[in-house]
Amino acid sequence: MRKKTDLHSHGTSEKQIEGFVQVRGAREHNLKDVHLDIPRNALVVFTGISGSGKSSLAFGTLYAEAQRRYLESVSPYARRLFHQMSVPEVDSIEGLPPAIALQQQRGAPTTRSSVGSITTLSNSLRMLYSRAGNYPKGQDILYAESFSPNTPEGACPTCHGLGRVYEVTEQSMVPDDSKTIRERAIAAWPPAWHGQNLRDILTTLGYDIDIPWRDLPKKDRKWILFTEEQPVVPVYAGFTLDEVRHALKRKETPSYQGTFTSARKYVLDTFANTESPAMKKRVSQYMVGKECTLCQGKRLRPESLAVTFAGYDITELSRLPLKHLATLLHPYAQENTPDWDKLAAKNPEKAIVTQRIAEDLSNRLSVLLSLGLGYLTLERSTPTLSPGELQRLRLATQVHSNLFGVVYVLDEPSAGLHPADTQALLAALDRLKQAGNSLFVVEHALGVIRHADWIVDVGPEAGEHGGRILYSGPPQGLSEVAESHTRRYLFPDKEADIFAKQPSRSPQGWLQVAGVTRNNLDNLTAAFPLGVLTSVSGVSGSGKSSLVSQVLVELVSKALGQELVAEAEQGESIEHDTPATLGGRITAGMESIKRLVTVDQKPIGRTPRSNLATYTGLFDHVRKLFASTRAAKARHYDAGRFSFNVAKGRCGNCEGEGFVMVELLFLPSVYAPCPVCKGTRFNAKTLEI
């Protein structure tokens, strides 16, 4: 590691940087016994290529140790309620203040979480309506909880605060009415034996399951799909209608007694009661949502929606863009509305409450606007936000909190942010620093790196070839570190222009779309060149993701006849989904497209056992290779024997994890290598191959 550059030579005085966080012997992940001094009360940016060890140092070491020390001051009982990070591999850290982490991660798992809830602006807005709203004559005052769709007091009794009601229809359950019941015309019924059982029961009940669905009498179709009756009848498995009639006449012994369940009842009961995500996902495709007729999609009780402020009910106000909401509230915060004097004279208490809540909302909204988030609405659901938007929302909350003496650890706050908005982000970071806080930022954006007071460059390469501190000091000093990849971009050599223009390719065709309508896109027409790399740009919130990640994917998928399966976030289910209308059409270019592959930012692994080799299928070949050896064949070992997810080959002590958890009461759990397999994850017999 290069020694710290002389502070005076780069315009940063010792007076500006007061004290250091001293890290000694950091060995978390790929860090190689790192010794480092990091200044406090400064903007410190951790740089280096992906996988070099930046996050291991900033989050895995500094933040994890700060959290551990903080939790030591919390009562043992309360400590158990926190999600505690593992104890970092480090000899010592001195001079470390309390830390708050703002990481690149998804928000709450359901769409009931919104911009308003994670910024707590919705709480203030509900208080504003409760204490300062205009009530209809004779209506009693409502508490703030009555303006939340997530509480029994406020949720619409019909849709339970969802804004939509879900039902099943004949068209959704029977997509092809030319099929017979025996040919599985009722797609909503279960597959395999259970579905065959229901078809056999219909035969016993006297229904002909061998004529097209459309030819059945309407009364029969309605009973089969929607009845709540559950008759128990004898079942003659595999018999035709005539054979069943003869068997009943002769009083033959049936195969068994079966209970009939209509298609609607099966779908709704399965969705409500099953614990299988796969079963829930299957039946959800037969459910159709529509806007709740009682609340008109506003999710609240009628008495809550009857209360207004500035002519809006609370849902209408929550649907305004934040910049419009700030404009609406500003006159109330300044006591400058046309009827303010009248309000103050008639109801001074209400005037005071209105002014104070409006002022608080205005101040908090101004921070969001300065971070370029004015296009969002309070009602915007969390899962639809990008990781960068989520992190900037959390950053705005911290800017408004006015904490002092805290370390903020941020993970690429510029991610997804247009360069035009970067200056606003830097201004917010400066406000936190000027308030007496320290900022440790993991970042790749050159604009943020250049703005840093101090740079910690980690590398030189990724993985085992990284984990060393190449440089720690003011930004200008990095220009002297030859092995730094960051230096090449921060201080590019004129002789070797890394930004030299590459030869461009000519389009081999054009994919043209028209009438695109989604979110803020209104009847848009666009053309995408084929056979080339295309970048879709625009400021944050301009509609890039709506166009490319949503509409374009859906239109191409539909044109190819592919089933577009959007993986729900953990905890998501159909009752939280509001289907978006497929707005737009492809006018030309589909003849050149044979396949659609969507690559997004969602985690690829579903379980902790998932790794790069298992996800890509590489490990399948490795297992087959071991199974093909002479020793494995002699022992009759198949490929499954060499999987740490299968009991016959994995270590029985750690169940293929490679480590065991040692649970310590009131302390973070400690993970240690398995004493039986020594971390290899397999049993001794398997390892002999």
From Swiss-Prot:
Keywords: ATP-binding, Cytoplasm, DNA damage, DNA excision, DNA repair, DNA-binding, Excision nuclease, Metal-binding, Nucleotide-binding, Repeat, SOS response, Zinc, Zinc-finger. Signal peptide: none annotated. InterPro entries: ABC_transporter-like_CS (IPR017871), P-loop_NTPase (IPR027417), UvrA_DNA-bd (IPR041552). GO terms for biological process: DNA repair; SOS response. ATP binds at residues 48-55, 538-545. GO terms for cellular component: cytoplasm. A zinc finger (C4-type) spans 651-677. The keyword Ribosomal protein does not apply. It is found in: Cytoplasm. Residues 211-491 form the ABC transporter domain. SUPFAM superfamilies: P-loop containing nucleoside triphosphate hydrolases (SSF52540). One of its GO terms (molecular function) is zinc ion binding. Forms a heterotetramer with UvrB during the search for lesions. The UvrABC repair system catalyzes the recognition and processing of DNA lesions. UvrA is an ATPase and a DNA-binding protein. A damage recognition complex composed of 2 UvrA and 2 UvrB subunits scans DNA for abnormalities. When the presence of a lesion has been verified by UvrB, the UvrA molecules dissociate. Belongs to the ABC transporter superfamily. UvrA family. This is UvrABC system protein A.
